[in-house]
Amino acid sequence: MFQTRRRKVERLDFIVAGAQKSGTTALHYFLAKHPNITMGDQQEIHFFDDDATFAATVDYERLHKHYPLVAPSTMAGDCTPSYLYFKPAAERIWNYNPKIKLLVLLRNPVERAFAHWNMQRFKGREPLDFFDAIREEKTRIAGAPPTEARRFAYVDRGFYAHQVERLLKFFPRDHVKVVKFEEFKDKQRETLASIFSFLGLEPLRSVRGKDRNVVPYERAMNWEERIFLYNLFANDIAKLEQMLGWDCSDWKL
């Protein structure tokens, strides 16, 4: 039998760039199941948000070493949700491969903020209660190292409009697919088919759902917190609706 010649990955074909706590782990799972995709040896490689990597001549082999030899038709992807939020990442990715495709999942920013805080509490990294944390966020992240700042950026990560705008400054609209988390969750098969089509691939023949790795919630978000956050996000949600042609009424109070 003839063996297909395998090649070394020299450029990634796509990246799942965000947003954190918006279904990216599940999307990574389904992408990795596709026979024509490799997602490398780990989720969240964090190459393009590592300032030390870009302080001198960039060695992209440090990225590509995470990928096996692949068939000519295999696409290589990464899933690092912090890239959407980390300001230098878009330009760094464009310099690396201006033809790359980007996938972005966006969740109701109010729910995303609470899920983010809950994850930090679960990991033992967050001493503050949620309302205290979101009210003190600006002070906490001001001047903090990037890794620490984004760890506690519960609100700031939810201002999606300017983050998506930053991607579109570098990449053409047909190379950036933005998906609502709620649609991905409720219409998973159809949404996945659309994502694979965007990548130029056939859909998976069968879609077995990923077992959810649910972090138990310490408590529920109260109404005061929900109103406070929605008032912060309302203008940005409206801007996102206009930019993407979305209906985000399910994100509103």
Where do the PLM segments sit?
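Distinct, well-ordered alpha-helical segments
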Residues: 88-93, 191
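The conserved 3'-phosphoadenosine-5'-phosphosulfate
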Residues: 165-253
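Surface-exposed cleft-lining segments at the edges of enzyme active sites
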Residues: 81, 142-156, 212-225
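PAPS-dependent sulfotransferase catalytic core
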Residues: 1-85, 95-100, 105, 109-145, ...
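Short, surface-exposed basic-aromatic patches at helix termini and helix-loop junctions that form
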Residues: 93-95, 197
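Acidic, metal-coordinating catalytic cores used for nucleic-acid/nucleotide bond scission
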Residues: 81-85, 156-157, 183-187
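Short, conserved clusters of charged catalytic residues that mark active-site
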Residues: 12, 58, 85-88, 159-162, ...
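Generic structural signal for well-ordered alpha-helices
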Residues: 60-64, 90, 164-165, 237
